[in-house]
Amino acid sequence: LLATHPYEEPAFDFYPLLNAWQQAGAGVIGELPSPETELDFLKRIKKTFEVGCLKHNKLAGREIQTVALCGGSGAFLLKDAIKNKADVFITGEMKYHDYFGHETDLLIAEIGHYESEQFTKDIFQSILKGVMPHNQIFISKVNTNPIKYL
C-alpha cells in the first residue's frame, strides 16, 4: 500500500466478518413428503426447471425422498450430499469424471448452470417486496444464458 501511495498515509480499516449464522452454505437439503421413483422424480425436475434435457447417472431402482440441491457449479458439494445420505443431488453442472463411482451412493441430476439459477430472481423479488413493500421491484426478462441447445 505504501509503495502505491508513498507520499501520504493510506486510509484503511479491517473488519472481521462475523457471520451470525455459521450453518449458512451454498446448498440445501430437504425431504419430500413421500418417496418417488427415480424416473418420476427426474421427470418432475425436468418439468419444474423447464429444461429440455437433463443429465443423470445410472438409475439404481432407489426411492427418492432426501434431496440435496446446489444451483450453478455445485459439484464441490457432491461428497456432502453423500455424507448427509441424500438420495439425489441436483446441481447445475458437474465434470464428466464426477459421475464415476457414485452409482450406489445417490442419483445425480445435472440440469444446466443457467437453468438451475433462473428462478432466483423471482425469489429475490419476493424477499425485496417483503422488505420494501412500497417500492416497485422489476425483474429483467433478458435471458443471459450463453449456452444454446439444438
Report the location of each language-model feature.
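Hydrophobic structural segments
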Residues: 2-150
